[in-house]
């Protein structure tokens, strides 16, 4: 794991790295769907795909680079493999059935958890110097 940022301050390299990891996992999921039940494939997804999507997503998840579309496509492929669905099956119902968040919802959830940890004063000390709650309950002061 790690975050890859290129000389142009673009997240494209990092997102391509995540796509490559998910592609490798998709191969494993595709092979497993012939032999193991859905709950085991979901565990494999949670072990091999989900950590790469979640890692530092607050930093790179709002990137508008071309790689984000490919990443979303790769996640959909992984979901179809977990659910043993056809290659053109609509993914939204599968996400609900499997109780898995798509990339966009993962970003929202991780961001909400981060903001919650700011207000509950549960950040590491290195972050506490940057994010300081103000008197207002609705404002977070960012000091740089």
PLM regions and their residue ranges:
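Hydrophobic/basic alpha-helical segments
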Residues: 1-144
């Amino acid at each position: 794991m790690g975050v890859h940022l290129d000389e142009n301050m673009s997240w494209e390299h990092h997102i391509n790295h995540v796509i490559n990891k998910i592609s490798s996992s998709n191969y494993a999921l595709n092979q497993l769907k012939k032999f193991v039940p859905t709950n085991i494939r979901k565990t494999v997804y949670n072990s091999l795909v989900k950590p790469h999507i979640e890692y530092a997503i607050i930093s790179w998840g709002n990137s508008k680079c071309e790689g984000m579309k490919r990443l979303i496509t790769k996640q959909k492929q992984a979901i179809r493999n977990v659910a043993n669905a056809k290659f053109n099956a609509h993914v939204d119902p599968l996400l609900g059935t499997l109780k898995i968040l798509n990339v966009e919802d993962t970003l929202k959830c991780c961001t909400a958890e981060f903001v919650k940890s700011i207000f509950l004063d549960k950040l590491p000390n290195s972050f506490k110097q940057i994010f300081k709650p103000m008197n207002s309950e609705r404002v977070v002061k960012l000091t740089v």
